[in-house]
Each structure stands twice: as C-alpha cells, then as structure tokens.
Curated annotation (Swiss-Prot):
Superkingdom classification of source: Eukaryota
Pathway info: Amino-acid biosynthesis; L-methionine biosynthesis via de novo pathway; L-homocysteine from O-acetyl-L-homoserine
Gene (name only): HSU1
Protein name: Homocysteine/cysteine synthase
Matches recorded under Gene3D superfamilies: Aspartate Aminotransferase, domain 1, Type I PLP-dependent aspartate aminotransferase-like (Major domain)
Organism: Saccharomyces cerevisiae (strain ATCC 204508 / S288c)
Amino acid sequence: MTEIEFGQPLPSNLDYAVSFGIPTWDSAIGYAEKVPEVIGKMATGYPRYFPQPPVQRLCAYFVKKFGRGSENCRPFPSVNLGLKCFEYVKSVSGPESKAHLEVETVTIKNRGAKTSKEPAELVLTIAAVLASEEEFETVKEYWKLRGECVSSRLALSVNQLLDCANHGSEQVLRELEAGVFAAKKGEEKAKNLIKGRIVENRFRPFGLEKKTPNWEGLNLNPNEDVYLVSSGMSAISTARNLLTFWEEKKNSGDSLNKTTSDQKKKPLLCDTVGIFGFPFKDTQVIMTKFGKCKFFGFGNSRDVVELQKFLETSKQRILAVFVETPSNPLLNMPDLKKLRSLADQYGFFIVIDDTIGGLNVDILPYADIVSTSLTKLFNGASNVMGGSVVLNPKSSLYPYAREYFRSANFEDLLWCEDAIVLERNSRDFEDRTLRANANTGILLNDLLLPEEGKICKKIYYPTVTSKETFENYESVRNERGGYGCLFSVAFFNEGDAKAFYDSLKVFKGPSNGTNFTLACPYVHLAHHSELEEVSKFGADPNIIRVSVGLEDIQWLLKVFSSALDVVKSRGSKHS
C-alpha cells in the first residue's frame, strides 16, 4: 500500500523511517506554508527538520527536568556540539539571550565483560539547548543545518535507560545494558566495513578497475581518508568547518608550512565559498548562515566564465567551490575538468557532493573533498541517517585535513546501532544502483520522454537536461555507470502538476535513493517562499521530483501511465 496519510511514517510499517507521507499536492502546500491544521497532523518527519518520536520523547524529558516556562529543546550527542549550538544562539540573540545548555549522562555497566580490555562501563552524554519563542527557532535552524542530531536509535536507548533508572527492574536494566554493549562491540567492525566499501566503490565501481590516467598515484586509506558522520548535511557542514580550519591554520603561526616571511603577514581571513549550480537548498543556506557565499546558480559554461571573471576582478578570495554531481533537483552536471583547472589556477578547493551520482560517476580526481549523504541510495532502506567525508590525498588541503580530523574539532558520533544498520543495508549497493538505473531509463525512454513538450513541459535527467550536462556527465561516467535513479518532470501549469501528483500511486514524501519509488513536489517543499527567485535558475514550481525504486518495471509503467492519463483527460491547452 503506497497510500500514506500526511505526517505518518513512510512506509507505514518501517521503524525509524526517514521519510513521511505527503500524499497530495494540497498537503504539500499546507506543509510548506506551515498551516497549523496540516502541521498538527505530523507524527514524524524528516529527522533533521522534525524530530522522530524517540527524539520528541527525549526533548520532553529535558523540558520537564530543565525547562523554564514555554521552552522547547533540541538534543545533541555530545557536549561540544551542544555548546556550539548554544554559542551560535547567543551570537544571534545577543546579551539578552535566555537560552541555556543542559547536560544529562547515563552510565551503563558492562556486566558481561570477559577481559580487562573491554570497558567496564559506558557513559552516554546528551547535551540539549533549551530556548523559547524566537530563540528556539534559531536552535531548530542550527540543528537542521548542521545535521549533527541525536539519532532516533540513540534517543530510544537513552529513553529506555532513563526510564529503567527511575522505575525499572534490575533484569530489564541488565538486558538494556547488554544490548547497548553488544552494539558497541560491533561498532568498529561495521564502520570499518562501511569505510572499506566506500573506498572499493571509488576504485572498483561495479567490480571494474579504474583505467583513467586521473587515478595515477591516487590511493585511499579507509582508516585515514574516509570519515563517517551522522547525516549528509553533517558531511557538508564538516567540509565547511574544515575549510575554516585550513584558512585559520594557513594564516597563523601554527601553519604546517610556515616561514618567517609568512608569519609577518596577517591577511584578513577569508570566509567566502562559491556554490556552482542550483543545489539542494540547505547547502546554500548553511554557506550563507555560517560565512559568505557567491552563487553561480546555473552551473553551466557561462557560469564558468562568470566564476573566472569574479576570481580575476574581485579583491576577495574564495575558499572553495561546492558542486553537486549531478544537482538536485535539476540534474545539471558541471564541467569538473574546467572547475579543477580554475581551482588549481586561483588556489581554491573543490567540494563535491556526489549523493545523486554515486557509483555512476568518477569524480574523486577532481575533488579535494567529497561529501556524501549515506542516508540515500547507499543505504536504500530509508531507515537510518549517515554521511561520509572522503579526502583526496593528492590535494594540498590533505595534510591540514588529516590534522583537523585528528583534533578535537571532529568527533565520531555516528551511533553504533546506526552504523550496524547502515553497513547491513549497503551490502548490495552496487546491485541496487544498477537496477534503479535500469528502471529509470525504461520509465523515461518508454513512457515519459515521448510526452515531453506534449503533456510534460520538461524532463530533467542527465541524458536530457541539456546537451552540455550530458557531455559533462559522460566525461566522468564510470564504465558500467548509468544516469541514476532521480529525475524531475515539470508540467505546463499547476493544475496538471497537481493532477499528476495526486493520482500517482507511488509513495509520496521527501528524500531520495530509496528502494521504493518516491515522489514529491520538490520546489514547493524546499522553496515555496521564494518561487519567483528560484524560477530564474530553472526551478519550476510545477516540478515533481521522482526517485525511482526497485519495483517491477511493468508495475511502474502502469502507475505512471495512469497518472499521465489523468493529466491528458484535463485537456489543458499548451501554447
């Protein structure tokens, strides 16, 4: 059953579901406009935006114990992260801030320890920032953008342990403790397997050795060059933090390559990055909230020229250019070779988000950092959050990056139970990628593309978005790689878009890369308050974004054909 009520877990029988039902166009608009009658129906939501039930319960615990008046809170999995949020809120609110940071610890005993090498106990620490009204909006914004949230599995464990400590039996406590220690015991193995899988995916996608000269001398060590974080957004924010670390180190007396003349110079620190192409919304927001951002929203050859003009004429540098390969939701592909050339010429870094392209594209040789959401296709099952940061050892950033990840600036906070689930779900990543590629190609070529210009206004996919995108994509496509599972279809008017969406009998909600087909009116969900502005970059408000799953292709053709028939029956006139 793909009919999921608004605000309910999607699918309905999935524990820790990261998506939720948005079954109709009107419910999507109501959600985007924060209509109380709509928002009030939400039992769960996308975890960075709306705490899932276990996290809601943990918030309630903090509010009851530490709250003042009408406060609410957001919890973090370490004191350091909670403190960073607290300091950010104070920087926004000023000296009048009434937000406060509260910390709760739960100590559990390893009663089953068999050797002295095993820890005798484990301390779980949760740091929550509590605030009311406008300040709480700032807390929520930070929690959403940084992506360093308490996971639902961690929250559930903490809730159960707190309950047991207050009024539980000794036997139940022992069982809970044993469960956590069993997961902690499997944590290192799971994370090592994930890191090894990520490296294998880079060097031998679909089992084929790299043959391109770009890989000459490029080797990855899974223990030194791959880092796991708690979400894809955390991977982006970690990359941004690393750039600031590099800039501060380079311009301080602690520079790794300092000279006497260097120490005499005290240039102003650069906090500007570029975004090349129209990206996932939160990527742009985080760059503007925590620094400065120069936006090249088309991400095409003309923007390459504009970027070069900016670099030649502007008095300020840029730290890096962030790109998506391809972009979400317009599936544009930048010219990575030209961007790499400019980066080398003008001394900036390239950060690539390859969440959408995944195994299909060979992008590491062009990147200094690769940030990926493992929540999406890598995981597939849509029941766990995670992200990764991969370093290019040939980058001039690399020695600073290694120092950053060894310092207190970085904490490995991917919860053990999440790592175990993520490892298990990702074992068939290659096979699922090939199957999703095939389903998407058939669905587009046999059904939707023949309707482009007739029923559909425009289809966005690496093969058809534009000639330039296709050529750029082909230049980095892996030998067995396809074009991905994500496409967007724009309709001529809102009525047609609404008719198609409401009648489409697949799961409908946010996220992508799921094993099941998932659709949403993406531009409204992400940009409803700025439709006119984003339309300048091709983000049509009548776009439906579709992530194609692993269902039987004949079933997919049938349900999409039925939805198209509903649009045809409207008889809209398209000039």
